Amino acid sequence: MIWLRSSVVLLIFLTLITGVAYPLLATGLSELMFPYQAQGSMVKQDGQTVGSELIGQPFTKAIYFQGRPSATVDYPYNTLSSGGSNLATTNPILDDEIKRRVEQLRQFNRQPDIPVPVDLVTASASGLDPHISPAAADFQAQRVADARHLPIKVIKQLIRDNIEHPPSEFLGEPVINVLKLNLALDNLPEKKQ
């Protein structure tokens, strides 16, 4: 009977430590040391929350850059069902999806002969990636410039200004946060002469 009592005491003790004390301590420290990140890296414009730096969102208008496709079900970029599509590279369904996406992107961007960057036609592992490659942004630049009646050089400079470099070259490739890039677009004057 003594072993049962000590087991229950140990269970209660570990539950309080790992289920209450540790989460409260971790949350409190993160709120003190990293408040922006602890709150989800929410991006605000004019006092309104417009999204998170960490979660992609759909942009369908021609005046905006588009992100990677979402692999989530129900609706795009659904954080409750994040995860990859789990389709193998040899799966014909994935092949058909990629072909369909390539055709849609070529039509939407009026780029019938230019290769479509792979990150515009494949979802990330989480299905929620907010970043695209500089090549993916360049692929869309002419469409965005035309839709906004801006010179292409203005859009190309904005792309360069929004490239985020990894801390070291072996830790990843340069990326662009689509939400930040689109907000920077919205902050440009409507026409530049």
Swiss-Prot record:
Transmembrane spans: 8-28
InterPro entries in the cross-refs: KdpC
Membrane-topology annotation of the record: Single-pass membrane protein
Top-level division of the source organism's lineage: Bacteria
Entry's localization field: Cell inner membrane
GO terms, molecular function: ATP binding; P-type potassium transmembrane transporter activity
Pfam families for the chain: KdpC (PF02669)
Keywords for this protein: ATP-binding, Cell inner membrane, Cell membrane, Ion transport, Membrane, Nucleotide-binding, Potassium, Potassium transport, Transmembrane, Transmembrane helix, Transport
Main location, first listed in the record: membrane
GO-annotated cellular components: plasma membrane
PANTHER family, A to Z: POTASSIUM-TRANSPORTING ATPASE C CHAIN, POTASSIUM-TRANSPORTING ATPASE KDPC SUBUNIT
Assembly: The system is composed of three essential subunits: KdpA, KdpB and KdpC.
Family: Belongs to the KdpC family.
Known role: Part of the high-affinity ATP-driven potassium transport (or Kdp) system, which catalyzes the hydrolysis of ATP coupled with the electrogenic transport of potassium into the cytoplasm. This subunit acts as a catalytic chaperone that increases the ATP-binding affinity of the ATP-hydrolyzing subunit KdpB by the formation of a transient KdpB/KdpC/ATP ternary complex.
UniProt-listed NCBIfam families: kdpC (TIGR00681), PRK00315.1 (NF001454)
Name of protein: Potassium-transporting ATPase KdpC subunit
Protein's organism: Photorhabdus laumondii subsp. laumondii (strain DSM 15139 / CIP 105565 / TT01) (Photorhabdus luminescens subsp. laumondii)
